[in-house]
Amino acid sequence: KALYESLSRTSAEYIKAKLSSIKKINNGYQIRLDNDENITCQLLIGADGALSRTRELAGIEFSTTNYNQQAIICNITTTNDFEDTTWQRFLSDSIVAVLPLSNTQASIVWSANNHLAEDLISLSNEDFVKRLENATEHRFGRLKVASDIYSFPLIERSAKDYVKENLALVGDAAHNIHPLAGQGANLGFSDA
């Protein structure tokens, strides 16, 4: 939200469309969007995530490492105050992180092997909360799931080339890592 608000204070134009094709031209790229709009640019920056369409269309190869784990994510609310403190616990079979969004709301990232993750994602919200309260040692009072619960596979990806003539990949389009260290966003900011 903050990034979109910052964008509105600049001369940058936000176009809600997906990348259909790119074509290298003498001094940059010609880009075609799925709304049939064509754009020409001198520098194409792919900042479009781990499954980067820019990287794919540019033909940039990448390596992958499958961690055989999933990240389970959701938002929760609590009866206690998170006190603006991020909290992480390393369990024998998983890692749970609590990332405050406000005094009483937080985002959960629970990294677990595929088998445990499938078990957790199949639980009712009530049973999921019980497991989460145990995993967080009941530090945050009574928890309640405040969003849908999602999961996604944890796969490290690294582009063979981050830069080509008139093109650069940044953030997860260039490299993404396990969320354990919480450094993905920092790496992306460093790229920019």
Describe each region flagged by the PLM.
Residues 1-19:
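Helical element adjacent to the flavin cofactor pocket in flavoenzyme catalytic cores
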Residues 13-14, 25, 34-40:
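Glycine-rich phosphate-binding loop signature in dinucleotide/nucleotide-binding domains
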Residues 15-29:
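A conserved short coil-to-beta-strand element within the FAD-binding core of flavoproteins
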Residues 30, 37, 44-149:
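Conserved FAD-binding catalytic core of PHBH/FMO-like flavoproteins
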Residues 40-42, 164-165:
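Active-site acidic short loop of glycosyltransferases
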Residues 118-187:
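FAD/FMN-dependent oxidoreductases across multiple families
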Residues 189-192:
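Internal hydrophobic alpha-helix adjacent to the cofactor/substrate pocket in enzyme cavities
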